[in-house]
Amino acid sequence: MGNAYIVGAVRTPGGKKDGKLKNWHPSDLGALVLDELVERTGAKGEMIDDVIFGCVSQSGAQAGNVARNAVLSSKLPESVPGTSVDRQCGSSQQAIHFAAQAVMSETQDIVIAGGVEVMSQVPIGSNIIDSFKEGHGQPFNGKGMMERYPGVQFSQFAGAEMMAKRWNFSRDDLDSFAFASHSKAI
């Protein structure tokens, strides 16, 4: 099994609601990061085997495989594929794991992983809210889920409470872990 290495990292400035990045199309924002990463690392575009981006709200400007659209908006060759991952808050982290797995399994050599969201254009939850408005139903009331989890109203909050109860995590345990994690990131 091969090894995977992170050889470069690029990000846009942190944005805020209706801030300076609000009018950037998500594909163009992703393309900016792709082009800068290739520039900084000296990689040749044709050497890139894949682009994997996390994106939670894949609707509106972020629909239609935003990772591939970012590739097409970038200077990378059209031959470079791209795929988008939705693992909710862990989407970009999952993209990195998928990239590492591809390299470690030796099925790919160079993979760019990251994520893109322009929440001023596609606010959190808008993909579900818009679906409700259009009468397309909701994602958490399939027969199998309703039978397996009777009376459970699914949300990140309910899920967090269920996991804390099941694994016996106290609020203090979780706060301490979150504080330690945040401290490592700064």
How would you label these PLM feature ranges?
Residues 1-15:
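N-terminal amphipathic/basic leader segments beginning at the initiator methionine
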